[in-house]
């Protein structure tokens, strides 16, 4: 028996998963994220029909971190031909931690996909080549997508990440040695960390990502964000690579394209129907929100939704 999607259902799901927040660990390798209270918990759902539902801390903004990798890819898709993107970054799951150098070395500096750090850095390098003000352009895109003109970067988080960026810099320089990184590494890293430091709420994320459930169109915008084919491609990448080395487990448990961030957020998509955002800062071993995944698993079961 499936249940009707409403605020009460979402609130009930949050209460079921709340104990999991005590079992995870808030990201502490980025000092500015370590101060976020582990008990925060929110969820929001937007449908292509124009309805939005929410529960918990759905309006509190947090650092979206790697969820931004989807947005930077979408931005690049509007400025490059397909073959220009995919000759520099792959479309396959990595099976490795998101900041691994080993696979990158073995595979001649071409990242497996755009959602691991190496792949996202290549995408940011591409944006640096085509945009005069990449950070400002990303802000404009995000503000338009979610209808919130006051979306900002958390500069303290961006600065904190830059001060602890040795591994990401190593990834970028390794790719540069293989000829797969064209701009100044420091400049691109600063853009990348600002994208990760976007502050958004669950409600804003659900609205912003609705275009992926609606064949590339945001219902409130006149022009498509990306084409229907590109929307399908992004959803496919999220389904196979969006949750780092736990992407298979997420597909098994939840059955939706999803993308996580170490800020504790997860965005999920039911094509042709809805976008969902959850937030709980306590993470599992792979850097995914423990309570967030559990909430999505219960929601998928309760409303009878899966892409499989």
Curated annotation (Swiss-Prot):
<dbReference type="InterPro" id="IPR015868">
    <property type="entry name" value="Glutaminase"/>
</dbReference>
<dbReference type="GO" id="GO:0006543">
    <property type="term" value="P:glutamine catabolic process"/>
</dbReference>
<comment type="similarity">
    <text>Belongs to the glutaminase family.</text>
</comment>
<keyword id="KW-0378">Hydrolase</keyword>
<feature type="binding site">
    <location>
        <position position="262"/>
    </location>
    <ligand>
        <name>substrate</name>
    </ligand>
</feature>
<feature type="binding site">
    <location>
        <position position="161"/>
    </location>
    <ligand>
        <name>substrate</name>
    </ligand>
</feature>
<feature type="binding site">
    <location>
        <position position="244"/>
    </location>
    <ligand>
        <name>substrate</name>
    </ligand>
</feature>
<feature type="binding site">
    <location>
        <position position="192"/>
    </location>
    <ligand>
        <name>substrate</name>
    </ligand>
</feature>
<feature type="binding site">
    <location>
        <position position="168"/>
    </location>
    <ligand>
        <name>substrate</name>
    </ligand>
</feature>
<dbReference type="GO" id="GO:0004359">
    <property type="term" value="F:glutaminase activity"/>
</dbReference>
<feature type="binding site">
    <location>
        <position position="66"/>
    </location>
    <ligand>
        <name>substrate</name>
    </ligand>
</feature>
<protein>
    <recommendedName>
        <fullName>Glutaminase</fullName>
        <ecNumber>3.5.1.2</ecNumber>
    </recommendedName>
</protein>
<feature type="binding site">
    <location>
        <position position="117"/>
    </location>
    <ligand>
        <name>substrate</name>
    </ligand>
</feature>
<comment type="subunit">
    <text>Homotetramer.</text>
</comment>
<dbReference type="Pfam" id="PF04960">
    <property type="entry name" value="Glutaminase"/>
</dbReference>
<dbReference type="GO" id="GO:0006537">
    <property type="term" value="P:glutamate biosynthetic process"/>
</dbReference>
<dbReference type="InterPro" id="IPR012338">
    <property type="entry name" value="Beta-lactam/transpept-like"/>
</dbReference>
